Each structure stands twice: as C-alpha cells, then as structure tokens.
Amino acid sequence: DSSTSRGLGDVYKRQVGGNAGQPETAAARKIMGQAKASRAYAYYYLAQLFQNSYDPAQPILPYYDGELTETAKVPASQIYALVVSDLTEAVELLDGYARPDKSKIDKTVAQGLLAYVHAGMGNFAEAKVMADAVIASGYPVTTAGELAYPGAGSGFNNVDTPSWVWGFDLSEELGHELIDGWGGMDVFE
C-alpha cells in the first residue's frame, strides 16, 4: 500500500528487518544489499566532502545507528568501518542477483564501490582485489581509444560502453528524477 509507505527506508524495515534483519528470500537479499550499498555510498560521499584525505582519527560526521537522537561527530575510522562493512555485506547479499539494467545496484557495483573506498583509504591491495573482481565479471578497463573518441560513442557519453558498471541512460522520459536526486552524487563530477 503506497499510501502508508515512506519509501525505501520503510520497505527496508518492514521487508528485511532493518539493520538487524536476516533476509531469507532473494527479494529481501536484493533490497538489503542495495540499501546497504546505497547507505555506504552516501556516507562515503559525505566523508569525502568533510575530509580532504583519509585521516582515521579526525572526527568528520555524526553516526546514526537507528536512533533519531542528535549525536556528535565520530572519527573517520568509524564511518569508514561502517562503509566497508555495508559494502562487504552488499557484495554477499547481491551474489546471484541479475539486474535488469545498469541503473540498479548489483554485486559488481558493490565491488566497484568497495574498491573505490579501499583506494581512498590507501588500502591499495584490497582495492586491487575488488577492482580485479569487477574486471573478471566482464567489465574491461576503458581503453584510451574509447576515452579519446569524440561524440556519442565515447567512454563518458554512453552507458553502454562495456566498462561502465553503473549508470543511467539519460532520456527525456526520466524528467527531473535523476537531475534532482542521485545525478549529482559524485564529488568528482
């Protein structure tokens, strides 16, 4: 019933039990995996905004564990531990999920995000393991030719470029949905 739903958070709590939930069905595992990957990505994005380079001891963000009480900033190490934990769980939960298109988060997206986070923390060996897993799953490294080609078929202009793991095919049908939401979520764009 959409009249009582409060979005993904409500579905996450009702269908999979929130943070403590143990999803039993494939649908519940998908929801939990995508929710954890989304939360990890949001926290990582915020961490990048409030810290120029990874300093585990620097207090950067408040950490909310489900209680809606005001909380103080916690050290980056605590935020990054949550991010790594969420993405690691997302990789496990999304194993076997076949997404309908590149706009959905699947195991490979979670692995790519985890590689990104490990690289940001200076954990280059772990970043390589995750990046290699993404490449091994069928996403090759973008070639110089794909990047240099001007126009509609180049590496950054087409979601169908083989190396793109996660993205949206921008079209008029999307309206303002992407522009107003996740479309501007990467600090490096």
Put a short name on every predicted segment.
Residues V16, F50, L87, L94, ...:
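Alpha-helical junction/boundary sensor with strong preference for TPR arrays
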Residues A47-D55, A98-R99, G120-N123:
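Short coil/turn linking the two alpha-helices of tandem helical-hairpin repeats
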Residues D1-L49, Q78, E92-Y97:
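Conserved, well-structured interaction surfaces
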Residues L68, K128-E189:
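Hydrophobic-face positions in mid-chain alpha helices that act as interaction patches
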